[in-house]
Structure formats: structure tokens, C-alpha cells
Amino acid sequence: MEALQNLGIRRRLKRFFRRDGRALIFAMDHGFEHGPTDFEPVWEHVNPKVIIRKVVRAGIDGVMMLPGIARIAGDEVKPDVGLMIKLTSKTNLRPKPDQLLQSQLAYVEDAIKLGADAIAATVYWGSPQEDTMIRQFAEIASYAHDLGYPVVQFAYPRGPYIDEKYGKKEDYRVVMYGARAAAESGADMIKTYWTGSKETFAKVVEAAAGVPVLMSGGAKTDNPLDFLKVVWEVIEAGGSGAVVGRNIFQRENPESMIRALIRVIHRNEDPEEAAKAEGLI
């Protein structure tokens, strides 16, 4: 991919990935996309400064947030932690059919002014509004790449046709398609769904043709060990890590969860041993 030859893009990507080529990134866009009720399990985390301070202290590799949160709490992201600014989003206040489109909240220049190391946008592959999001992503990627900034695509298959043909949006065939479409549309990093098994996720990674694939953390699991096991399978499948929100900020002990995830992602530790070491089980 021509963009990956750009020194600026390569250097900024390294802000997120350690020498092992893997990353653990904290997601902080839920207040907008899901609403503040997502923070009710641990209400103090509704304050972005509080939770970002905790995750940075625990050793997170990168933090993803929307532009407004970057203005409010961006100072909590230390210089050795990658900052990813997501330029598109939507709320759950819309009627369901209208939730298949993410609108642009800000521009590449805004993200750069906020100190972004990478710029992110979502495409709902298979949505009736897919063409609008493709155009948005293309414009963001083209301009960001011209300025030497990597672009992350949240590649989410979603829509009535997906449900009708594949039964669920996590079917590996459609996740694999979305990952390939993300790579072919110019993404430098891909965030997408877990497909349910190491074998199927390996196909998603291969379909992305060398672009790093990170798993979307999804809903909080009741047992922390269950989530650690999934992340371990992602790594075993050749995935490059995870972008995690609720499985961190909805827990009373987010620092322990992050340290356990670091053990699994960066040290290749057994999930159960990692959980025990951090007091999660």
C-alpha cells in the first residue's frame, strides 16, 4: 500500500504498536454512541478525565476518543501514549433504521490540532447508507495520508441485508469481507468484530492483506477471564490486539483488567495466569 511507505504514517502508527507489532487501545466514544447509561456500572468513569487517567497509569498503548472528549481530557493522554481521534459517530437516539449511518463530527485539521497520532472513521459495510460512509472515509483518508497521518477504519458489517443473508453481523464471511474492503479502501489499521473462533478470525486477518486487524471489545463479559480468553485467541489468530471500552470502564478495577490484557497481548501469557496475577479471579 503506497500510503504505508510514507514515513510520517509509519512513525505515527508506532505510537500505538509496541515492538511486537501489537496494541491495546482504550475506546472512549460510548458516551456519544451509546449514551451516559453505559457508565452507570461505575459512575465515576462518566468523567473522561478520571477513566483516562486510570488507563494511562495502567500502561495502555493508545486511547481513542471523539474530538470533544479530546478537548476536555486530552491532557490526560501522556506523550508516550498514542492518541486516536475518531471523526465520525451517531447516537442511539435516532430511530433504528437511521442508526445505519455515521455522520462526520469534525475534520482532519481539527484532529491534528488536538494532537492526534491517528485519525479514525467508521464504515458500516452493507448498510443502505454505505456509499455515504465510503465517501466520508475516502475524503478523510486522502487528506490525512497527504499530511502523513495514519487512518483507522472501524469496519463494521451492519444492516438488514447482512442479517437476512448471513444471520448475524459477526459471521466470519461478512467480517472478512469488511476487513478486506477496509484494506482496499486505504485503512492503515482495522477495528472489527470477533468472529467467535480463532480459526475464523485468522481468515479475517489474512483477508486484510497485511493491514493490522484489532478486535472490537464489545459488551462487558460477566467474568473477566472469558474476555481474556477471547483476546488470547485473537492474538493466536494473528490479530494485532484489541480496542476495548466497556470491558475496561464498566469494571471497578480497570487498571487490573488492563494489566491482565497487557500480559496476554504483549507477553503471550496464559489468560488464566494473567487473571490470577492481577487479582481478577
From Swiss-Prot:
It is found in: Cytoplasm. GO terms for cellular component: cytoplasm. It is an enzyme of class 4 (lyase). GO terms for molecular function: fructose-bisphosphate aldolase activity. InterPro entries: Aldolase_TIM (IPR013785), DeoC/FbaB/LacD_aldolase (IPR002915), DeoC/FbaB_aldolase (IPR050456), FBA_class_1 (IPR053414), FbaB-like (IPR041720). Keywords: Cytoplasm, Glycolysis, Lyase, Schiff base. The keyword Hydrolase does not apply. It comes from the Archaea. SMART domains: DeoC (SM01133). GO terms for biological process: glycolytic process. Pfam families: DeoC. NCBIfam families: Fbpase1_Arch, PRK07226.1. Belongs to the DeoC/FbaB aldolase family. This is Fructose-bisphosphate aldolase class 1.
